[in-house]
């Protein structure tokens, strides 16, 4: 009895210590994320103010990105794939140089007009920093636990959604499985990172929806149908990204030639298509949806295509923010077709296409709750569940373990 009590006390003591350790780790990650976010906001402002000076140099920026990563990246060129390999213990090292290289590459992509996000880099920053710290700490399985902890902190520091960040980090590595051993430090690190980033002026998107819509059987059918469409869209994005990268890699084997040639094409397209409307994160399109500004029926499709081309060419950045944009703009179009308030359908698309693209369920539901308000959690649950079932196990993270069933 005494031995069992001692064992329990040691277990709970270690668990508590893990949770406490997550606080300073999260704070450090939150500081880095805040600086990174400010950098991205600054280069975005420069691009918007001087679009016709920046876009012509997109191809040249691509050359710099690829050349620098080829020379200095080493194994770190694997990006999120390397993060997943380390989580599965197929690799054992995450070089610290991944952090500055990823930040520089993403900043150049956005300065010169590429269509990309920031989440992938934010998660990499958190994962690399926390994994490195975890190797110095005297905990069992510390590097793996703190890898997940850092992913949560990175997501929360960038997006200001700590609950969704925790769930995303423990859910995303293997579809259908949760890394519960990292739950407590991920929780404390996530809230710590979010708080520090907020203190430094980084605010989450607040896109509250103010619509009263009773959940009738007819609405339920329409919500499920929306979820199916959103899930297919997110899954299709992941599938197209994977196969476009493969196709371009086979057709244009030299990465410098590939990024330059496609960069030239992209710079022309971005200029012709509403003068940079589809450059960058796409938050301008999300704001247009929720502020009642002009939204074209094909906005989502053009953002879809241009983001895939940008990332497949060799430019750097995440996929999640474009997924939010694709979902919101597609949702705005479908809301009119399905007789659902545009704000509500756009909010549902924002979360569900993210879930369909990342092959996550709970993270998508809570992203919806944290961004748009928890009053609509039942709607997010219905739509995101349908999206998760119908995304066909596709994921933007090609190294994600697919343990959930296939439809």
Please place each PLM-identified region on the residue numbering.
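Alpha-helical transmembrane segments and immediately membrane-proximal extracytoplasmic
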Residues: 1-407
């Amino acid at each position: 009895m005494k031995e069992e009590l001692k064992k329990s006390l040691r277990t709970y003591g270690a668990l508590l210590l893990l949770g406490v350790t997550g606080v300073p780790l999260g704070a450090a990650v939150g500081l880095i994320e805040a600086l990174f976010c400010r950098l991205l906001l600054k280069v975005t402002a420069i691009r918007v103010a001087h679009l016709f000076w920046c876009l012509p140099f997109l191809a040249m920026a691509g050359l710099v990105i690829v050349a620098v990563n080829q020379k200095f990246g080493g194994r770190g060129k694997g990006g999120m794939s390397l993060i997943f390999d380390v989580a599965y213990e197929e690799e054992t090292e995450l070089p610290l140089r991944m952090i500055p290289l990823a930040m520089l590459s993403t900043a150049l992509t956005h300065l010169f007009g590429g269509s990309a996000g920031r989440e992938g880099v934010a998660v990499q920053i958190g994962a690399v920093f926390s994994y490195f710290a975890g190797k110095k700490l005297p905990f069992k399985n510390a590097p793996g636990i703190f890898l997940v902890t850092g992913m949560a902190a990175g997501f929360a520091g960038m997006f200001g959604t700590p609950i969704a960040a925790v769930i995303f980090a423990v859910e995303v590595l293997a579809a259908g499985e949760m890394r519960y051993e990292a739950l407590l430090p991920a929780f404390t690190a996530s809230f710590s990172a979010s708080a520090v980033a907020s203190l430094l002026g980084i605010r989450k998107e607040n896109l509250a929806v103010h619509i009263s819509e009773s959940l009738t059987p007819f609405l339920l059918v329409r919500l499920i149908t929306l979820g199916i469409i959103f899930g297919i869209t997110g899954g299709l994005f992941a599938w197209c990204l994977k196969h476009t990268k493969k196709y371009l890699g086979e057709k244009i084997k030299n990465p410098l030639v590939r990024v330059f040639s496609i960069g030239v094409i992209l710079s022309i397209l971005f200029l012709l298509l509403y003068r940079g409307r589809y450059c960058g994160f796409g938050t301008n399109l999300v704001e247009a949806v929720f502020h009642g500004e002009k939204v074209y029926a094909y906005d989502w499709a053009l953002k879809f295509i241009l983001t895939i081309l940008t990332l497949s060419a060799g430019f750097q950045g995440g996929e999640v923010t474009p997924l939010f944009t694709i979902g919101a703009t597609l949702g705005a179009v479908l809301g009119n077709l399905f007789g659902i308030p545009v704000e509500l359908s756009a909010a549902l698309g924002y979360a569900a296409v993210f879930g369909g693209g990342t092959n996550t369920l709970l993270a998508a539901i809570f992203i919806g709750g944290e961004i748009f308000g928890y009053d609509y959690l039942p709607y997010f649950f219905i739509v995101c569940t349908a999206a998760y079932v119908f995304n066909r196990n596709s994921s933007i993270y090609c190294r994600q373990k697919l343990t959930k069933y296939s439809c």
